[in-house]
Amino acid sequence: GYVTSEDLPILYTLEGHGEKEMDSTIKEDIEKANMDIQSLNLLTEGSVPDDADCLFIDSPSTDISEDEKTAIIDYLENGGKAMIFSDYTTEDLPNFDAVLENYGVQREAGIVFEGDNQHYAMQMPYYLVPTINSTDASSETVSGGYYVLVPYAQGIKKMDDVRDTVTINSILTTSDQAYSKTDLNSDTLEKEDGDEAGPFDLGVSITETLDDDKETQIVYYSTSNLMESQVNQMVSGGNEKLIIESLKWMTDTEDSATVSIPSKSLSVSYLTLTDYDAAFWKICTIGLIPGFFLVVGVAVWMKRRKA
């Protein structure tokens, strides 16, 4: 449930470009965290509404128009906030990419694979378990000891030539053994010539300090699969925790002193095992533990024989 003292912060979700529909569980969790979700068609509206507390862009599968790009950048350059997700696509998205590049980040070509088995799960090197860095948008997730699971992500590249008023912080980072596979029709999952070497950011927070005490804030994650409820359950709610914390960092306005009462989730929590952990427990269950009982059994038998 939730308690409010003022109007709720409004989260406008961009529509009209084949965006993913928000997972119903995460939508419910955002509403429980005291945010009002409205849809936004920039083609008809022309600009981001004045009452927007945050713009939510969920992985457009076709590009935004030149006018929409201008409207989004205008909103952000006036101290706007945005949470942005993208997914790997063979489509060119020059206007969408221009919004990201205006704030110093680019999408790497390909999908990130992890070479370190402590950083991927379920024997799938593209189900990434990145390091969560402590930032204003992620510190509670870190201190709570959560993991996040990030499937099919692209690398995020920080550009060298960005305004000095822009600060980019890494939220999610792969190991330095990660690589980005550009040829997804390849016969191998191993690193090949032409694959970009890591480490890579998979999530960043971006701030830009403006003249009139305003601050632009953006959180960008390079896969919308972060929001899938099945993926979230595998890490006992870690993904949801991070997304909600990122949104709260941006929408924490002084004039909406809201109190959220987290509801207990009845969904199943899975044991989060990286591939390294899984291999260790496999050795224990197949070898060490049965071996221990065998030794004990032999000792008992020897004792009885002597008796």
Map each language-model feature to its residues.
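Short, surface-exposed patches at the edges or C-terminal ends of soluble domains, predominantly
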Residues: G1-A307
